[in-house]
Amino acid sequence: MVSQRVQALLNQLRTQGIADERVLEAIAQVPREKFVDEAFEHKAWENVALPIGQGQTISQPYMVARMTELLELTPESRVLEIGTGSGYQTAILAHLVHHVCSVERIKGLQWHARRRLKQLDLHNVSTRHGDGWLGWQARAPFDAIIVTAAPLEIPAALLSQLDNGGILVLPVGDEHQLLKRVRRRDGEFIIDTVEAVRFVPLVKGELA
């Protein structure tokens, strides 16, 4: 039995076009209040992005659901997330697939995200402190790659780590960003534009 706040959010997401019941169920199961600062807990189930420190944000639930839905995940999908952030998107993915790999360039965020995921008994996640532009070559190829910050162009390393038939979902651009879905098919990349979005930039390198 979900609370009224959770049900209200799920109804709003359905109205906004989210149709994948597995994604909606994951949204309902992951306690978003555990991934935000105490000062913002009262806003945790609102359909808004919230600050998490270090100039980063936790994406609004609609965008989390939309990007996750676009990945067309199955339980067997090998998933790479670029930008662990608070760990909220990671937790949603962990409810949908057997294992998630996630890269975060800011060490402090990675540490806190890993702690939160363990507290929620989500042990099917591997996190790594590193440069998201480079992906995670040692774990490639991936069936699905999701990027939660916006590069100016699609990183070549991520394209190379996408398996045949795989899907990459990411925002691209500077001031005017567009959400893109890239599907790899027989060595070619088919790119679709989904909608206008606003994300923090995907910065190269890693921070201690």
Swiss-Prot record:
The gene is pcm. It holds the Pfam family PCMT. GO terms for biological process: methylation; protein modification process; protein repair. Keywords: Cytoplasm, Methyltransferase, S-adenosyl-L-methionine, Transferase. It is found in: Cytoplasm. Belongs to the methyltransferase superfamily. L-isoaspartyl/D-aspartyl protein methyltransferase family. PROSITE patterns: PCMT. SUPFAM superfamilies: S-adenosyl-L-methionine-dependent methyltransferases (SSF53335). CDD domains: AdoMet_MTases. The keyword Metal-binding does not apply. The keyword Transferase applies. The active site is at residue 59. InterPro entries: PCMT (IPR000682), SAM-dependent_MTases_sf (IPR029063). Catalyzes the methyl esterification of L-isoaspartyl residues in peptides and proteins that result from spontaneous decomposition of normal L-aspartyl and L-asparaginyl residues. It plays a role in the repair and/or degradation of damaged proteins. This is Protein-L-isoaspartate O-methyltransferase. The lineage of its organism: Bacteria, Pseudomonadati, Pseudomonadota, Gammaproteobacteria, Enterobacterales. GO terms for cellular component: cytoplasm. Coiled coil: none annotated. It catalyses: [protein]-L-isoaspartate + S-adenosyl-L-methionine = [protein]-L-isoaspartate alpha-methyl ester + S-adenosyl-L-homocysteine. One of its GO terms (molecular function) is protein-L-isoaspartate (D-aspartate) O-methyltransferase activity. Gene3D superfamilies: Vaccinia Virus protein VP39. Its EC number is 2.1.1.77.
